[in-house]
Each structure stands twice: as structure tokens, then as C-alpha cells.
Amino acid sequence: MFGLKAKSTKKVLGSIPKHIGIIMDGNGRWAKKRLKPRVFGHKAGMDALQEVTITASELGVKVLTVYAFSTENWSRPQDEVSFIMNLPVTFFDKYVPVLHENNVKIQMIGETSRLPEDTLAALNAAIDKTKRNTGLILNFALNYGGRAEITSAVRFIAQDVLDAKLNPGDITEDLIANYLMTDHLPYLYRDPDLIIRTSGELRLSNFLPWQSAYSEFYFTPVLWPDFKKAELLKAIADYNRRQRRFGKV
């Protein structure tokens, strides 16, 4: 049940995007501005994620997909990668109780084979604990790359054609979507309505390239650790000033 403040905020904002994707960028620069190591920014980014998740849940957002670690991020310094890989352990230990209380369901997309055992264990434990929740889906894109996702889907489709499980004529956009990592999401909410990128960068960085075909984009110079409730509301207000045409006039 929404509180009076949440209901009032929804009324002012107008239409709430059902699926929001966020490219959480700027942790390192945020730390550098404070003369701190990059890992300090990643830690601060966890607090921002918790606040944004609860806010999105209160507003009635159905899916929040966050770009936590890309397939390209393995090329970063090893000590930073190790710290980032431990963040899910810390995040879930600290925040799963409050997310669970708010009926948030945790899921993920990405290739799990390279994830450290403790990272994967923490993720699976959080998924299992919240699997019966019916509220917002907090969908972590962890070791995720959009091109790799599409390549994998093509391979599976090709194999099914070879195995006579599919005819080439059966291949449609909807069928391809069923082979993507987002196929576990509710059908109506698989594609983001709004994609937000923080830190002033103006690119997708391999984030949901198929699913974002008709997404609205919001780029902000705000660094991720500073992206809290007020910034999310600004992004949604901007989204409401758009007219989504989906290729039509």
C-alpha cells in the first residue's frame, strides 16, 4: 500500500515507466573528487542503489534492471574487479532484509560461469529468499554484455533449427526475445521504457541493445553515488514530457 506521500508523488509525475534500466556510472570519479580510492565510490554506489530501488518500488515500477558489471569490466585493475565482485555479498547481506520487507524480488541476467563462488552464492541466496515476492523485480545485469547475449540467442536458435525443433520461418522478433536473458521477466515488462545513464556519458555501453529499441533515454551528469530519490523523480518527470511513438507518426 502506498503512503499518502508516494500517492501524491505518482499523481504529480504522471505515467510511471514499468521497466527502468540504469547504467550506474561514475563511482570512480565520485571517489576521485573526494581524494578517495575508486572502491570507495563503488561502496557509496550501493547506498544509492538501495534508495533508488525502494523509491522505484513505492512508485509502482515493475522492473528495475541495473548494469552492475559488464563483460568488458574484467579488463579493469584486478584489485578493483575483486572488490566489485565482493559487492553483491556486501549489498545483499546489508540490504536484502529491507528489500524483502518491501516485497522486492531479486533476479539477474548475465553469464554466471566467471563469477566467484561467494558472489554467486550470495546472489543465489538473495534470489531464493525473495523468489515469492510479488513487487518490483530488481534485476541485476552482472557479467552481462548485450552482443554476447544476442550471439548466444542466435546459437541456440540455430541449434534448434538443426535439431528440427524450429523451422526458419518460425523465427520472429517475439521468438528471438524468448531466447534472450530477459525471457524470465513478465512479458509486458521485458523491454525498458526508460534507460538512465549517470555521469554524463552518452552511450549504452552494450546494455540491453535488443530490448532498448524503443526505450526513452535520460542522460544526467550526476555521478551514480549522488543519484538518489530526487534524481530518479527528475528522470521520470522528463520521461513524462516525451511522446512515445514506437515508430509511428
From Swiss-Prot:
GO biological process: polyprenol biosynthetic process
Enzyme Commission no: 2.5.1.-
GO MF annotations, alphabetized: ditrans,polycis-undecaprenyl-diphosphate synthase [(2E,6E)-farnesyl-diphosphate specific] activity; magnesium ion binding; manganese ion binding
InterPro entries, A to Z: UPP_synth-like, UPP_synth-like_CS, UPP_synth-like_sf
Gene3D superfamilies: Decaprenyl diphosphate synthase-like
Gene Ontology CC, one term: cytosol
SUPFAM superfamilies: Undecaprenyl diphosphate synthase
Keyword terms: Magnesium, Metal-binding, Transferase
Active site (catalytic residues): 25, 73 (proton acceptor)
Binding annotation for Mg(2+): 25, 216
Cofactor, free-text remark: Binds 2 magnesium ions per subunit.
Record's subunit section: Homodimer.
Protein name as catalogued: Isoprenyl transferase
Protein's organism: Streptococcus pyogenes serotype M1
High-level lineage: Bacteria, Bacillati, Bacillota, Bacilli, Lactobacillales
